[in-house]
Amino acid sequence: MTHFWQGLRSGRWLTAARARGYSLILLAICALAITGWIAVSDGLIDRNGKPLGTDFSNVYAAGSLTWQGRPAEAYEPALQHAAEKAVFGGREVPFYGWHYPPFFFAVAVLVAAVPYAWGLAIWLAASFAAYLAVMRAIGRASCRERVYHPV
């Protein structure tokens, strides 16, 4: 048993091919979970009464207010909540609020230029692309400085 734990701690078993394989398996599981989550939702509201994309709804609502020429209303909680509800046809949704600086309206107005589901997809894809870019940069840096550090 000691040999097993030593092998696990060393990290030698985790090859690049295994890391890619495990990552793809995890990605497939997440894709299935998201598909199931969307399948059991009621329109754009999940089973818990929250919007799909939860706090993205505040970004989309603020962008909608900006398109209507009323961006300052995003900083008024009651008006922002009303805008969040309006995104979902007036249904009761949790209040997420707008806590971003004014320059973030530039992002909000872009995602609010399309229907909510498309805006959410764009938001998630852009976030994931940024995540991958950072992970790639970290990976390159760690390859240059590869040092064995036992646990």
Each model region followed by its residue ranges:
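Short, intrinsically disordered terminal tails adjacent to the first/last structured region
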Residues: M1-R9
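Sec-dependent N-terminal signal peptides
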Residues: Y22-I25
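Positively charged, low-complexity/disordered segments
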Residues: G139-A141, E145-V151
